[in-house]
Regions:
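Active-site histidine-anchored catalytic micro-motif
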Residues: 1-139
């Protein structure tokens, strides 16, 4: 088995910004020259996450509204008292969704469903430079 580690850099808008990173991950897998294995994506930071979703405008709207219902932005959070930042909800949302995702690949192709894309989600309250660590294990 071979391990290859790469990085994907992003500029996000914050506030539940959802970015389709599927093509970037496909490119990294293709360039790895590994034929079959798994690719693990890890988001650096505690206010962003990664998942799969059908990247469709109305579903993305539903996705954002769901987070506002589950973990509302405009209620008191103890964390907000710590640093004076109003992003307690951002940390909670990111921890619930999670910082990592693993996708298998065969013949250098990700084994995703037809309507399944890899989505980076930034829950923080401001634009940020973000980083996804991509680690490929395969042969």
């Amino acid at each position: 088995m071979t391990v290859a580690t790469r990085e994907i850099g992003l500029q996000s808008k914050g506030n539940c910004d959802v970015i389709d990173v599927t093509s970037q991950v496909e490119k990294v897998v293709e360039e790895s020259r590994l034929n079959s294995g798994i690719v693990t994506l890890f988001v650096v930071g505690s206010t962003a996450a990664i998942t799969t979703i059908e990247y469709e405008p109305r579903l993305l709207s539903d996705f954002r509204q769901t987070w506002e219902r589950v973990i509302p932005q405009n209620i008191p959070y103890e964390h907000n008292k710590t640093w004076g930042e109003e992003n307690g909800h951002s940390h909670l949302r990111a921890s619930l969704l999670g910082p990592s995702l693993t996708v298998p690949f065969v013949n250098r192709k990700l084994l995703l469903g037809t309507w399944q894309q890899i989505a980076f989600v930034d829950f923080d309250t401001r634009p940020r430079s973000r980083k996804i660590i991509v680690q490929i294990l395969g042969e």
